[in-house]
Amino acid sequence: MAIRKYKPTTPGRRGSSVADFSEITRSTPEKSLIRPLHGTGGRNAHGRITTRHKGGGHKRAYRLIDFRRHDKDGVNAKVAHIEYDPNRTARIALLHFLDGEKRYIIAPVGLSQGDVVESGANADIKPGNNLPLRNIPTGTTVHAVELRPGGGAKLARSAGSGIQLLGKEGAYASLRMPSGEIRRVDVRCRATVGEVGNAEQANINWGKAGRMRWKGKRPTVRGVVMNPVDHPHGGGEGKTSGGRHPVSPWGKPEGRTRKPNKASDKLIVRRRRTGKKR
């Protein structure tokens, strides 16, 4: 994938860029693998906004992605197409299995139309193949990693993300996450070899607010420009700093959103960014 830049023919075009979609080989999805997707506009069943800054956007169909793959062990599949998925940053690959079934997987770097992929403990170590962590050599970069055996891929699914297998000891494997966190995961958990493709997606300059609206993202308004009735930082004569530490519209201090006593925290060897040992 490459990034295409535009000449500044309009203010919205100036500086904006798009993906060139050169790796895409098919423009319409497999009909048997899509489901309708109904937007909520950030509202719950009572019609109240529970998630701000959501609403509108282009109509989408959800592509059913196979995040498990364990039921296809030993059945080879050919990559029929690399497709665009509006519901995620990564590209997806349409697989045609030898038994006639079709499925989508996340497309890693190096996977192209016509390649053959497989899953199972005896699969080769090459991009797109799915194996248990115990069968993957130390130092390999993987993605779509399970947190619990058979639970389906949960880690490293977005564009450009990858997890490094640092080592294996007993029933656990040590993984370095994209955030820098080092975590232990059961060696029976499965992972797909390679790094997720479309890494250049992070370099796209969206250029104008309208492109965010196409994606279903509404504006984010700062509290300091609101009135006192709307936000704790609102009001004041002229421009003000808010006069207090950052808080939410309901007065809760910013940050500290991570659950401090989550059961799986005991498997974290080194925290992200901070480098503190547990």
Swiss-Prot record:
Record field: compositional bias (Basic and acidic residues): 253-268
Pfam families, sorted: Ribosomal_L2, Ribosomal_L2_C
Gene3D superfamilies linked to this entry: 2.30.30.30, Nucleic acid-binding proteins (2.40.50.140), Ribosomal protein L2, domain 3 (4.10.950.10)
InterPro entries reported for this sequence: NA-bd_OB-fold (IPR012340), Rib_uL2_dom2 (IPR014722), Ribosomal_uL2 (IPR002171), Ribosomal_uL2_bac/org-type (IPR005880), Ribosomal_uL2_C (IPR022669), Ribosomal_uL2_CS (IPR022671), Ribosomal_uL2_dom3 (IPR014726), Ribosomal_uL2_RNA-bd_dom (IPR022666)
Region forming the signal peptide: none
Biological process terms in GO annotation: cytoplasmic translation
GO cellular component, one term: large ribosomal subunit
Keyword Transport annotated: no
Biased composition (Basic residues): 45-57, 269-278
Top-level lineage group: Bacteria
PROSITE patterns: RIBOSOMAL_L2
Region (Disordered): 33-57, 224-278
GO molecular function, one term: rRNA binding
Family the UniProt entry places it in: Belongs to the universal ribosomal protein uL2 family.
NCBIfam families given in the database record: rplB_bact
Summary of the function given for this chain in its UniProt record: One of the primary rRNA binding proteins. Required for association of the 30S and 50S subunits to form the 70S ribosome, for tRNA binding and peptide bond formation. It has been suggested to have peptidyltransferase activity; this is somewhat controversial. Makes several contacts with the 16S rRNA in the 70S ribosome.
Subunit structure: Part of the 50S ribosomal subunit. Forms a bridge to the 30S subunit in the 70S ribosome.
HAMAP family: Ribosomal_uL2_B
Name by which UniProt lists this protein: Large ribosomal subunit protein uL2
Source organism per UniProt: Mycobacteroides abscessus (strain ATCC 19977 / DSM 44196 / CCUG 20993 / CIP 104536 / JCM 13569 / NCTC 13031 / TMC 1543 / L948)
Organismal lineage: Bacteria, Bacillati, Actinomycetota, Actinomycetes, Mycobacteriales
